[in-house]
Amino acid sequence: MPGKLLWGDIMELEAPLEESESQKKERQKSDRRKSRHHYDSDEKSETRENGVTDDLDAPKAKKSKMKEKLNGDTEEGFNRLSDEFSKSHKSRRKDLPNGDIDEYEKKSKRVSSLDTSTHKSSDNKLEETLTREQKEGAFSNFPISEETIKLLKGRGVTYLFPIQVKTFGPVYEGKDLIAQARTGTGKTFSFAIPLIERLQRNQETIKKSRSPKVLVLAPTRELANQVAKDFKDITRKLSVACFYGGTSYQSQINHIRNGIDILVGTPGRIKDHLQSGRLDLSKLRHVVLDEVDQMLDLGFAEQVEDIIHESYKTDSEDNPQTLLFSATCPQWVYKVAKKYMKSRYEQVDLVGKMTQKAATTVEHLAIQCHWSQRPAVIGDVLQVYSGSEGRAIIFCETKKNVTEMAMNPHIKQNAQCLHGDIAQSQREITLKGFREGSFKVLVATNVAARGLDIPEVDLVIQSSPPQDVESYIHRSGRTGRAGRTGICICFYQPRERGQLRYVEQKAGITFKRVGVPSTMDLVKSKSMDAIRSLASVSYAAVDFFRPSAQRLIEEKGAVDALAAALAHISGASSFEPRSLITSDKGFVTMTLESLEEIQDVSCAWKELNRKLSSNAVSQITRMCLLKGNMGVCFDVPTTESERLQAEWHDSDWILSVPAKLPEIEEYYDGNTSSNSRQRSGWSSGRSGRSGRSGGRSGGRSGRQSRQGSRSGSRQDGRRRSGNRNRSRSGGHKRSFD
């Protein structure tokens, strides 16, 4: 066992430490004489260098095991050896971050008792455990100062991510660059680290009232604040300021007077300072447009042009270095960006022609739900997918929707709002509280969609499909960050199914259609939360309730009494079933599975009409064909499900209640006419000619219904397109700060 080996090694090492200095020297001379007869020259020099004799050397297998423990996450064995063998080594060694070899070798020199050959073999094993990404991103591969490395490690960064590796060289060398990478991959540090190193390398005499050398423009206040924080976290020599609306002008004026090296901000407030003559951008050397697709859109393009036009001259190589970053870069961005770029510029695209544009660490789910049922279903989704401890963001389309959702009683967790009408000071308090876990649910508009880096977010909910694919990609990217996995759930109505397919096509993702959380899912999640809450109850408090608990056990029995208590603690005293197909309350989804493949749902209707009473069949609605054509699923009122199961007797068709929504071939489209047509066709079919006539009539009405539906969809699509065009064309009239 490793523990015994480690203890044995330490016990062996303790004996020579207690010897006097003269005894130690005498014994070492004797050992060296013996070693001439038993070891080759390499081994003799190794013994003299380390001052450790052969009777102290543990077998290599033991040392290898100890070193492997060190190179994983546990270094206790190494620390104990170090403390015992080197009295001057008082402080406990910190964890080795991500297998950083240089740091490991530097710290390991403190322990002179370790065998050199074993040390080298351990380094080789450490090399083998590093991934290709870690090797390519090792700090030693880049001109990064020790001070910056130390600050990066303080932020938990132990190597550069792929986008940072690809962009470091061009940014550090002063080249213009357009970079695209998925959300959550570290784009901010992609320009922050090399710019800081470049400025610190060429740092001039610090003067008061010095003009900024770096300008970073961001579309939202929240993103600007976060980018500024990232800069501040990795430099102590440079002055970093952040200007955005909703905050005091005076504090920003004081920053200008004291001198700024790196200025981060939103276009509106920076333009205000320029027009007032307080801010001088004539000394700019580097310009960064973060979320460039939004910065160059009509809503911001005019303000960006007003801010930086004085620093740019046509086709001049003396123009500032221009760096453009985003997770989404449509082709028009590249065309518009050329007016700011030098003739030779670099392009880094880690998305490229890959099918999937969204983050690969996010699972995308879709739930069909009528808008009136949405708050209640979202409450259940939060409970099952996030629990009481997980963090979640709910995106809504309007500020009014955000407020209503956050205040809805179905959202049991503590939720806070974030949108443009909230005062900036409160927005900052809200974001700080969400980061620190003071509350678990943030309900927001698109102000929280871009750039916010909160790795602990487990779940993103989109209350409806967004109007454009870029919004979906950025919203879903608020989870699954920094190597973690996440879930994004999009709610939709039947008429929005086309929007969902459009997002799938353009973002390169596939939504997994799921039903609302089942009763068992809710019970399991709530009971786990209740059990966890019991751990916080002190023994002193428990003593007060022992008599009552004993009385309950005698009356109800231990299991029933505890089950009732857990149900009450979790707030789950009752459950009302919902349709897995549409999320409607008061319905149960059932499946009717065939032993053979069926052509369409009419086969199931025929079988139901043959086996069940007409009254029972009339209760069935929303029938859908299952994947593989091996049956159907449908909804019945909660009161009818048990009666249908009791009436059903058929060995070739299996009627059951599924725990989760099965995979569906054809989805219910919100129109009951098709179900009615199929029912009437088959029931009339038993009457001969009239049945065929009824079927034909139903077919004609069905075709008319479908044509009307398509016409309505086209009109609805034109309305949505018109809204988007109006929004874009009028964007330049808005003021962004």
UniProtKB/Swiss-Prot annotation:
A motif (DEVD box) lies at residues 290-293. ATP binds at A181, R182, T183, G184, T185, G186, K187, T188. InterPro entries: DEAD/DEAH_box_helicase_dom, DEAD_box_RNA_helicase, GUCT, Helicase_ATP-bd, Helicase_C-like, P-loop_NTPase, RBD_domain_sf. It is found in: Nucleus, Nucleolus; Cytoplasm. Residues 1-131, 668-737 are annotated as: Disordered. The modification Phosphothreonine is found at T247. Pfam families: DEAD (PF00270), GUCT (PF08152), Helicase_C (PF00271). Residues 720-737 have a biased composition (Basic residues). CDD domains: DEADc_DDX21_DDX50 (cd17944), GUCT_RHII_Gualpha_beta (cd12936), SF2_C_DEAD (cd18787). Residues 11-20 have a biased composition (Acidic residues). Residues 380-524 form the Helicase C-terminal domain. Highest expression in skeletal muscle, liver, heart, placenta, and kidney. There is a cross-link at K125 (Glycyl lysine isopeptide (Lys-Gly) (interchain with G-Cter in SUMO2)). Keywords: ATP-binding, Cytoplasm, Helicase, Hydrolase, Isopeptide bond, Nucleotide-binding, Nucleus, Phosphoprotein, RNA-binding, Ubl conjugation. Its EC number is 3.6.4.13. Coiled coil: none annotated. Belongs to the DEAD box helicase family. DDX21/DDX50 subfamily. This is ATP-dependent RNA helicase DDX50. The lineage of its organism: Eukaryota, Metazoa, Chordata, Craniata, Vertebrata.
